[in-house]
Amino acid sequence: MPGLLRARRTDAVRLDAVTTFHLRHGVEVADALRVGRPVVALESTIVSHGLPRPDNLRVAREIEQTVRDAGAVPATIGMVAGQLVVGLDDAELTRLATVDDVAKLSVRDLAVAAATDADGATTVAATSAVAAAAGIRVFATGGLGGVHREAAQSFDESADLTTLARTPIAVVCAGVKSILDSGATLERLETLGVGVVGYRTRRFPGFYLTDGGFDLDWSVDSPEQVAAALAAQEQHGLHSGGLVVANPLPTDEQLDPALHDRTLAEGLMLLRREGVTGKAVTPFLLAHFHSATEGASLAVNIRIILRNADLAAQIAVASAARQA
């Protein structure tokens, strides 16, 4: 396939029925996978599209350090010059954080991006698929994509959901982004057979908010319980999909609910007025939150991803211990 580069630590990996990609592993990640050390996958979209500069690069490094501090190896995934990299080094991370034309890559975009030697940041869907193909079972992100509001008219639903239906990975998140339809997203996850467990809660979190307003059937109380669930899934062989681990913010760290609701209503009105659709919806609304809350939402967003990175690392450590 044109545009694919070969470098150290390169493996051919089949992501679907028709396309074979070459994954280049960072040295630290390759060594960790070889000897069975715990590894946590991290997305790169938060670096290139999710956070403003210069916070994006600083926070990306903090996320990786949080994973290390909890005993695991971070594997930030992205595409550099057409090649999928599992474990971006600091120069590659800096490149995706500072270059202006970094593409936002879901699973469907990977082939064309590779063929055109593109730089790209992977979404939850693409990161999950690549991580699972590389043998990584735990992934930390901020919020899951989901069913958009008014999806009955727009059919706008994140590929995160259908990808998780066929991808064996645990995704630690603070629920779905509160700009989405949480109830409809939970219904779709149920239909698709994707497990959802609350971490020390029976309520689905609302990203910026501790409580998103919906009950959950299952709750786990420790990283070891999540690791046991992943092991049972693999051993029983009854389901090859993902597991959403919903990790809510403590109530004293959430965004003020009244401010959240007011900002969301204003953002949705602006969205309709300006005709924003598709991939542009989420970054548009997140930017509105950042502006309207005078940076408060950004601070909450950063706390979310750091807390999720820490929990994901603990789960990866517990999973590795079970296999030792």
UniProtKB/Swiss-Prot annotation:
The gene is psuG. This is Pseudouridine-5'-phosphate glycosidase. The lineage of its organism: Bacteria, Bacillati, Actinomycetota, Actinomycetes, Micromonosporales. Mn(2+) binds at residue 156. Belongs to the pseudouridine-5'-phosphate glycosidase family. Disulfide bonds: none annotated. It comes from Salinispora tropica (strain ATCC BAA-916 / DSM 44818 / JCM 13857 / NBRC 105044 / CNB-440). It catalyses: D-ribose 5-phosphate + uracil = psi-UMP + H2O. Its cofactor is Mn(2+). GO terms for biological process: nucleobase catabolic process. The active site is at residues 43, 177.
